[in-house]
């Protein structure tokens, strides 16, 4: 009796068509360092506006303006003062998926010091960054601001500087559009300032009423996933995922064409 051994069966050879090979050479730009991130287009505008306004207010004193991404909230050297702008308006641009978004909750930290004997002072600034909530990348992106917004923010900085460093009173802080209450929820898990413990946003009464109405007529959120994180997952329509699905589709078409030609 002959024993049937299925593993000894010979399958007909498949002759796959040969396609011409080609290679695409592309060079990706190097990732910018923290020093390059500080030298953005708006950095020159900040210095230009600050120097012009300080020349009008205190022409006898010399001041320098430095961008410092390592500045810490409430961590001050002796003699230094602090001013915190909580509601600046800025536009962010993701360096990975090219998604852009507007935020009226940009936090800017200033540290100020004046040497009255030398009649010289220094201002250090840090603009807190945000994460892109579309692609979910862990890369922090910096914001860009309009010139009129920078002017109002510098006016507020100089008002605080005159109060804390020169002991002058009677200044007025400019209330710009971004400092008004906003009805959109601020996603603290994507905000660098929120992650460092700076509380700068709370929902308006209108937003609280809308959330209460939504909670009444809809199912309660899962305890394992807070409502604030809704929509913060992976975006399958981003460019990396589109390239992945296009590769899978091309592979399927290639296999179908190969089997048809072999038959």
Curated annotation (Swiss-Prot):
First-listed, main subcellular location of the protein, grouped into a coarse class: membrane
Zinc finger (3CxxC-type): 88-197
Gene Ontology CC terms, in alphabetical order: cell surface; endoplasmic reticulum membrane; plasma membrane
A molecular function (GO) term: olfactory receptor binding
Segments in the Extracellular topological domain: 260-263
Top-level taxon of the source organism: Eukaryota
Disulfide bonds: none
Topology versus the membrane: Single-pass type III membrane protein
Protein name: Receptor-transporting protein 1
Species this chain originates from: Mus musculus
């Amino acid at each position: 009796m002959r024993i049937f051994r299925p593993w000894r069966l010979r399958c007909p050879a498949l002759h796959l068509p040969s396609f011409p090979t080609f290679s695409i050479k592309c060079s990706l730009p190097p990732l910018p360092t923290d020093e390059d991130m500080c030298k953005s287009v708006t950095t020159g505008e900040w210095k230009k506006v600050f120097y012009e306004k300080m020349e009008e207010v205190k022409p006898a004193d010399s001041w320098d303006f430095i961008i410092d991404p390592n500045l810490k909230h409430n961590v001050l050297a002796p003699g230094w003062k602090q001013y915190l702008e909580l509601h600046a308006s800025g536009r962010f641009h993701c360096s990975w998926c090219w998604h852009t978004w507007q935020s009226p909750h940009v936090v800017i930290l200033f540290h100020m010091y004046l040497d009255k004997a030398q009649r010289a002072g220094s201002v250090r600034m840090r603009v807190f960054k945000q994460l892109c909530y579309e692609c979910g990348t862990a890369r922090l992106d910096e914001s860009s601001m309009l010139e009129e917004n920078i002017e109002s923010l510098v006016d507020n900085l100089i008002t605080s500087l005159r109060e804390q460093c020169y002991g002058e009173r009677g200044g007025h802080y400019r209330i710009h559009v971004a400092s008004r209450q906003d009805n959109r929820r601020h996603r603290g898990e994507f905000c660098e300032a929120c992650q460092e413990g700076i509380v700068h946003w709370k929902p308006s009464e209108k937003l609280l009423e809308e959330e209460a109405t939504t909670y009444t007529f809809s199912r309660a959120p899962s305890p394992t996933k807070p409502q604030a994180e809704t929509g913060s997952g992976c975006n399958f329509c981003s460019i990396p995922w589109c390239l992945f699905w296009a590769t899978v589709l091309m592979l399927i078409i290639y296999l179908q064409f190969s089997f048809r030609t072999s038959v």
